[in-house]
């Protein structure tokens, strides 16, 4: 049996949570792998040939356990010692926007994980999204969604 008051309370809690989303920034998102960006090498994205909007991106490059560092409350993995050194020299340059959360989700006022294989670099910043359907929405107006996300993120 459905309970209208519970549904109303849940909707209110969701609305309150989305309204409070800007306060959600903090440490880097870490999933069940125990690594930021699911253990993929964030420096390696710069060496991949970025696909045009509407086309799938090349697969992210997995990091290796022997090339890791800690930053922003998370463990980061890299494919090589050179990429590890580049990250350690300037982690903010390579870390994904919104602590690794989905750029479209942040633009909508939420906070959901980003998928390392659904990426785009815009003006030198790495953005992740959660699933292919979201990527298609986000790519309809990349600049507009980035502007929305920046307004939601502290």
Over which residues does each language-model region extend?
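Bacterial N-terminal signal peptides that target proteins for export
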Residues: 1-10
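N-terminal leader/assembly segments
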Residues: 3, 20-25
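Bacterial N-terminal signal peptides
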Residues: 9-19
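Charged, low-complexity intrinsically disordered segments
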Residues: 23-154
